[in-house]
Amino acid sequence: DCPPDWSSYEGSCYRVFEQKMNWEDAEKFCTQQQTGGHLVSFQSSEEADFVVSLTSPILRDSFVWTGLSDVWKGCRFEWSDGSDLSYKDNYQFVFSEYECVASKTKNNKWRIIPCTKLEYFVCEFQA
């Protein structure tokens, strides 16, 4: 079961936060919300669709941080919760000067943007 204000899907709990933070602060905020909490990670297109169903009505057409980043500058993107990057939403990773991945609230299109940008975000933890 998920706490009040959190939504349940496939054994995880999710919550949209209508405040903007940079990637690092948002990830830290998520870890402080619940044990095992992180910025959202996607393991399937169904999970991504579920998150879109949460974010789109609240945030309309904007971006949310995901837990995906290359903050260690290792030329390898990783989820902040340590899960496998098996689902990529057909995303072609072009390595740029930016390191953090945000997701479009309307359609889950990913974009690599500067980690210092202020964006809304979704936290997730295992129920």
Swiss-Prot record:
GO terms for cellular component: extracellular region. Expressed by the venom gland. It comes from the Eukaryota. One of its GO terms (molecular function) is toxin activity. Disulfide bonds join C2-C13, C30-C123, C100-C115. Residues 9-124 form the C-type lectin domain. SMART domains: CLECT. It is found in: Secreted. Keywords: Blood coagulation cascade inhibiting toxin, Disulfide bond, Hemostasis impairing toxin, Platelet aggregation inhibiting toxin, Secreted, Toxin. InterPro entries: C-type_lectin-like, C-type_lectin-like/link_sf, C-type_lectin/snaclec_domain, CTDL_fold. Heterodimer of subunits alpha and beta; disulfide-linked. Thrombin and prothrombin (F2) inhibitor. The IC(50) of thrombin-induced platelet aggregation and fibrinocoagulation is 62 and 35 nM, respectively. Its inhibitory activity is at least 10-fold lower than that observed for other thrombin inhibitors. Belongs to the snaclec family. This is Snaclec bothroinsularin subunit beta. It comes from Bothrops insularis (Golden lancehead).
